[in-house]
């Protein structure tokens, strides 16, 4: 009888361990390349608003690919502004040379921009400093979320 209980307990431990490991693999694949979001599962959504989600700024390349793919002006330059502290220029490194040449980064000169990108990482508190406020002549065209957590947003100028 004690041997059966021990074998049964060992099987339960193995099954629970296996479920935990499988879940970890699943979440890492689901969140790739934003694996740091795995830890957000331990917090509620209200708390996650207080933390940087895209701290390595991986979303820049993804947002730039989206902008290029959705732009109708094939031969012209695309002017991209940045409403966050994260520099955009090195986000283009994961793009082909042809796509890189289409992009012109204008910093926070929103008047020159066709698109504005933000990953909500700011140098200062936006409650008091409106450096990154999106102008009224831009409209939101993309929200990228994982598990209802906003990673980045792209705006397009209204013509």
PLM-predicted stretches and their roles:
Residues 14-156:
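Catalytic lumenal/periplasmic loop and adjoining terminal transmembrane helix
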Residues 1-18:
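Membrane-interface junctions at the ends of membrane-embedded or membrane-associated helices
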